[in-house]
Amino acid sequence: MHAAEKPEGTLSSGEYFIRQSWSQEQDFSRPYHVHVPANPDRRKLPVFLFLHGNGGNARASMPAFLRQHPVMAARYVMVFPQGYQNSWNISAERSQADDRLFIEAIVDTLAACDNVDPDQFTVMGVSNGAALVNQLAIETQLPNFRHYVTAVSPLNDLQHDGRNFKAKGDDNGYETIVTPRTGARILTISGSEDPLVPYYGGPSPVIPAKNGKLGFVAAEESIFLWAKAMGYRGAKLEKPSRIDGKLEFFSYLNGTVVHCKVVGEGHGAAGAIDQATLLRFLEHQP
């Protein structure tokens, strides 16, 4: 393992940095941690980025995630960016950075490496990290992202106002209507009993916004909005397409856009999604 400002040539495991300036910092080195498989079975590897939740830590979450996902760790370049002050800037968090730009800079950098497949980037986020994944899916113009995975944070009512997707903007005003890029695969995960992010929509009792508490789109409505954005023209699913124990899957566009309802779980619902379930989605298995 080593630390370097920027990887060049063949990517190896280590800590790297993106330099960024914003209202809180000037020319600040923002870290991200990379794990590259030791003996990969392909020359160019797909990339999986994991975005921690508010209060989380990339360095701490990395070993646990790798341990819980050994098959993925052997097949993917695994990347763990660090949020400024352990947060991602969505509405009223400690970070006021342009976090979309930070993640896009990581993607641009890694996509140029010899052993990376530039067309196979996945980004998964949990809670506050998932809100940033939503922002990326709404706003990014990068062609590299193939999969978006969000856990316990469906679209909030800033990102979709009931009629349109909205870009965050420099002051978190969410005023500009945008059309997300099509062609992505999307998996969303929510717990039916989440006390922080209401499964059936409405304001969070806890999560702050600039004015009051942050509101959320209902989880099943959120995936329907994503399905329509990706080209679906049918009716909203009122019943799950498939049930596997406490997991209820709502699948659109032949499994391209999927919501997983974790019955009885709260804000830790991501823990119910095992490696096999995640790989089934990433590798386009029915």
Language-model features, listed with the residues they occupy:
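A domain-start/cap signature at the N-terminus of enzymes
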Residues: 1-47, 76, 95, 119, ...
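Cell-envelope and extracellular/periplasmic
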Residues: 51-55, 84, 111, 126-128, ...
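Stable alpha-helical elements in mature extracytoplasmic
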Residues: 47, 61-62, 99-106, 128-132, ...
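Second-shell loop/turn segments in exported
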Residues: 89-94, 135, 209-213, 264-267
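Short substrate-entry loop that stabilizes the transition state in hydrolases
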Residues: 40-88, 156-160, 196
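Alpha/beta-hydrolase active-site loop
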Residues: 93-114
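C-terminal catalytic histidine-bearing segment of alpha/beta-hydrolase fold enzymes
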Residues: 186-189, 215-217, 223-286
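The feature captures the conserved acid-bearing segment of alpha/beta-hydrolase catalytic domains
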Residues: 146-147, 152-236, 250-253
